[in-house]
């Protein structure tokens, strides 16, 4: 996208954090009380300023739209129910490569395991992961429920979606 080979791409808030650290603020656990609050933030000046800052820094990305990718992140596990933070002790939980997401799992006693989304199904089926942090829609859509036995609907993170256009392509329009 930055080089102009792709015109558009979608990232989550957490995914953007690998490129633009300040985006992590959008992925702080339990920041948004509900959809209405999250949508108010997404439609407000914070996201507009973030998009402008990314463009001004020359990262080659132009923010086009912000939405939701399918709900809220919650913990889903293969072998044990989570009723307290102690239940996460030593569990290998899939995270994004975001330092914030990894630190959250670590602080709860789990073992953060950054893994590409395309590898999560296999990792759960092979026992390489004990759980993940995804929305119910993601769990069902990727058939993770075939291996997931427990779901703690804690809604710790709003799964915001940002649609980006290549600045290189934009300049050719």
Where are the language model's segments positioned?
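A ligand-binding cleft/hinge motif common to bilobed small-molecule-binding domains
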Residues: 2, 13-21, 118-125, 132-150
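Contiguous mixed-secondary-structure segments that line small-molecule binding/active-site clefts
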Residues: 7, 12-111, 123, 144, ...
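Short acidic-hydrophobic, aromatic-tinged amphipathic segments that line or gate anion-handling sites
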Residues: 113-116
């Amino acid at each position: 996208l930055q080089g102009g080979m792709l015109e558009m791409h979608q990232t989550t808030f957490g995914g953007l954090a690998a490129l633009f650290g300040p985006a992590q603020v959008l992925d702080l656990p339990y920041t948004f009380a509900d959809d209405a609050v999250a949508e108010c933030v997404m439609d407000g000046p914070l996201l507009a300023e973030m998009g402008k800052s990314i463009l001004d820094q020359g990262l080659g990305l132009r923010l086009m739209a912000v939405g939701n990718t399918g709900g809220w992140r919650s913990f889903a596990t293969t072998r044990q129910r989570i009723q307290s933070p102690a239940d996460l002790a030593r569990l290998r939980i899939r995270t994004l490569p975001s330092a914030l997401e990894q630190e959250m799992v670590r602080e709860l006693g789990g073992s953060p395991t950054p893994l590409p989304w395309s590898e999560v199904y296999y990792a759960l089926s092979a026992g390489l992961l004990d759980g993940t942090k995804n929305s119910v829609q993601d769990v069902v859509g990727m058939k993770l429920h075939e291996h997931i036995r427990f779901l703690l609907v804690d809604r710790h993170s709003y799964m915001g979606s940002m649609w980006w256009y290549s600045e290189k392509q934009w300049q050719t329009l």
